[in-house]
């Protein structure tokens, strides 16, 4: 073998090694980008939600340096697609909002301050997840941009507690509920998978200086959210499926005799309900919060002058019982 031939082969070997190294480095960078943590802070800097992307989407909720919820998972199953599994991030956008909202009918306030920071993560597969951080809580929702009508088979919202929390909850016997069950007080690490599910809202006492109120907003063409225990100091979402056939069940309700395999059949271009967490350091903040209103769909009525607040009376509830031969229905409460 000539000296020139040997030198050429050696040069090619070196080039191949360099190319392999560059390719490996490029793949490593891609993996690091795919697993990058995205952080969103509240305007006052106290609240943080840290979103981690790997083979799934998980997030932590923190107040200053205290972890309140950890490695919480989210996913939406649409048809045969798992939105949130092996996510491929395509775009990240941020913005800050500082506005005032004016309710048509004031409940707590005539003017509601709506100040938050927003993070929008767009993924391959025609979906996005929007996060918002307020000074008194955090929220997120799925957004899809799909053609036609879609079937939502399930939505996963898994919450993991870093310590034993005290849960103040209502436990219905099933999805058919009047939301009138008495509140129970459950140790999160003692809540078993065989125990009844719970409905919203859920109030959590971390046993430190924080309380967490969990609920939802902007429910349109979608079922209400319930939770079941995972048995390991965590809980996951559970939803009623779409009813297909009904039967008689008393004078004011229907019995579901057949269910679909999906929880919603809905428009493919839409935003889904907000899942929100009010974080309070004192109980006053729980009463003062307006998160449901702030996250609700904006009013679409052009004329609201006809809407007036007033009193309502339900004779079955207050015992007026204006029935029978002796009732002549004159003005007033008979």
Model-found features: residue ranges?
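Generic detector of bulky aromatic hydrophobic side chains
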Residues: 8, 13, 43, 142, ...
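An acidic-aromatic substrate-binding cleft motif
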Residues: 267-333
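Generic detection of intrinsically disordered/low-complexity segments and helix-coil linkers/edges
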Residues: 3-5, 20, 27, 53, ...
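Bacterial Sec-dependent N-terminal signal peptides
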Residues: 1-37
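N-terminal accessory beta-strand-rich subdomains and adjacent acidic, glycine-rich linkers
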Residues: 39-292, 299
């Amino acid at each position: 073998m000539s000296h020139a031939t040997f030198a050429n082969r050696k040069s090619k070997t070196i080039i191949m090694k360099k190319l392999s190294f560059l390719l490996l480095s490029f793949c490593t960078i891609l993996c690091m980008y795919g697993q990058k943590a995205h952080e969103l802070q509240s305007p006052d800097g106290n609240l943080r939600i840290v979103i981690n992307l790997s083979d799934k989407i998980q997030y932590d909720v923190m107040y200053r340096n205290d972890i309140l919820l950890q490695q919480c998972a989210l996913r939406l199953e649409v048809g045969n697609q798992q939105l949130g599994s092996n996510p491929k991030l395509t775009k990240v956008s941020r913005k800050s909002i500082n506005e005032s909202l004016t309710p048509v009918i004031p409940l707590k306030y005539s003017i509601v301050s709506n100040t938050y920071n927003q993070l929008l993560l767009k993924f391959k597969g025609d979906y996005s997840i929007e996060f918002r951080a307020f000074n008194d809580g955090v929220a997120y929702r799925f957004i899809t941009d799909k053609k036609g009508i879609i079937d939502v088979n399930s939505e996963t919202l898994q919450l993991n507690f870093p310590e034993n929390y005290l849960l103040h909850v209502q436990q219905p016997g099933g999805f058919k509920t009047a939301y009138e069950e008495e509140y129970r007080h459950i140790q999160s690490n003692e809540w078993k998978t065989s125990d009844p599910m719970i409905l919203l809202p859920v109030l959590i006492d971390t046993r430190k200086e924080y309380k967490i109120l969990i609920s939802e907003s902007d429910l349109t063409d979608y079922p209400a959210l319930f939770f079941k225990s995972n048995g390991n100091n965590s809980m996951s979402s559970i939803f009623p499926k779409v009813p297909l056939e009904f039967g008689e069940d008393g004078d004011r309700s229907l019995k579901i005799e057949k269910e679909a395999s999906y929880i919603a059949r809905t428009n493919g271009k839409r935003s889904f309900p907000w899942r929100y967490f009010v974080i309070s350091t004192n109980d006053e903040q729980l009463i003062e919060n307006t998160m449901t209103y702030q996250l609700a769909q904006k009013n679409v009525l052009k004329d609201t002058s006809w809407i007036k607040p007033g009193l309502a009376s339900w004779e079955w509830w207050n015992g007026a019982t204006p029935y029978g031969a002796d009732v002549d229905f004159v003005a007033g409460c008979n």
